[in-house]
Amino acid sequence: MDLKEAFATIFDQNRKVALYAAGTTVAVLGLGLVFKYMRREEKLTRVGVVTKLLVHPLKSGKAVSVEAAECLRMGLKYGELRDRHWLVITEDGHMVTGRQQPRLVLVSLTCEGGHVSLNGPQMEELKFPLNNSSDLVVDCRVFSVDVQGRDCGDKVSEWLTRFLEADKPVRLVHYEPDLKPQRPHEKEPLFPKDDEVAYPDAAPVMLMTEASVGDLNSRLDKDLSVFQFRPSIVVSDCEAFTEDTWDHIRIGEVELKRVIGCGRCLFTTVDPETGVFSRKEPLETLKTYRMTDPKQKTSPILGQYYTVRKTGVLHVGEPVYKITY
């Protein structure tokens, strides 16, 4: 091969490389443009501000009000406390809630330094280890759904049975990560198939607004607090019942997706300060104007259930943004 042919060969090879590179660049740019125009542009609208974060470690127990909490796929977490990760059950594993034992709302469960503390009016404080692998794992039933929990021992059982003045012994179980959870999708197909919760009625997060409770109070003889309705997140600086329209929201780095309205039951008639049933209000009044979700049949709606799309830390005082496209 002479010099002329060698240069011709090199030129031809370089031209092919250049054409290939140019083609690749055009393809990448083209895909970028397609992605840009196919991607929905996100719009954030401020709709309120977080005024309360409430963790309910014990299902039907007293709320723990915190200034900040982790928002995980299974709900709120504050230190060693996780939302609705403790459950009172009968000896055969069926759940016991404030619907059957209204005095449960007076029981405080806290946790520090690897030990759990139970407190209640006119009761001595009871402490026990958070993790005790020697305790049995038991099968439980929450609204006819099979779940599991680790039994917290006989002393805890005796304390709760005595405080509740129960006819038969009750026991306390604790949900641990390797145990069988609830899958909300099995009860309500609108929930994501991969959602898991411990012992909540339905969802990892329930949000409501102070204005909605204020609207209800304007129709009652006695003002009620948000604590009567057991939300995870309370929002203010908005109009009543606007949470019904917040399909997709962002709070800080957390993203939540609305699934279904929170249908209210007889439990709302338990006074969280006294543990006494009224059996009428506020449920009867709610039924007169909040039968707004056919999916909840005969239950009036107050608050909304959310699934956690993106985890993070929530803070009281953070703005709430509605996401639209």
UniProtKB/Swiss-Prot annotation:
Residues 1-16 are mitochondrial matrix. It catalyses: N(omega)-hydroxy-L-arginine + 2 Fe(II)-[cytochrome b5] + 2 H(+) = L-arginine + 2 Fe(III)-[cytochrome b5] + H2O. GO terms for cellular component: mitochondrial outer membrane. Keywords: Lipoprotein, Membrane, Metal-binding, Mitochondrion, Mitochondrion outer membrane, Molybdenum, Oxidoreductase, Signal-anchor, Transmembrane, Transmembrane helix. Signal peptide: none annotated. Residues 85-175 are annotated as: MOSC N-terminal region. Binds 1 Mo-molybdopterin (Mo-MPT) cofactor per subunit. The chain crosses the membrane at residues 17-36. Its cofactor is Mo-molybdopterin. Residues 37-325 are cytoplasmic. Residues 179-323 form the MOSC domain. One of its GO terms (biological process) is nitrate metabolic process. It is a single-pass type II membrane protein; Lipid-anchor. Its EC number is 1.7.-.-. GO terms for molecular function: molybdenum ion binding; molybdopterin cofactor binding; nitrate reductase activity; pyridoxal phosphate binding. Mo-molybdopterin binds at residues 59-60, 84, 230, 264-265, 305. It is found in: Mitochondrion outer membrane; Membrane. It holds the Pfam family MOSC_N. Comprises two structural domains, the molybdenum cofactor/Moco sulfurase C-terminal (MOSC) domain and the MOSC N-terminal region, forming a cleft that accommodates Moco. The MOSC domain, which contains a large seven-stranded mostly antiparallel beta-barrel, engages multiple interactions with Moco both pterin ring and phosphate group, allowing for a tight coordination of Moco within the core of the enzyme. Catalyzes the reduction of N-oxygenated molecules, acting as a counterpart of cytochrome P450 and flavin-containing monooxygenases in metabolic cycles. As a component of prodrug-converting system, reduces a multitude of N-hydroxylated prodrugs particularly amidoximes, leading to increased drug bioavailability. May be involved in mitochondrial N(omega)-hydroxy-L-arginine (NOHA) reduction, regulating endogenous nitric oxide levels and biosynthesis. This is Mitochondrial amidoxime-reducing component 1. The lineage of its organism: Eukaryota, Metazoa, Chordata, Craniata, Vertebrata.
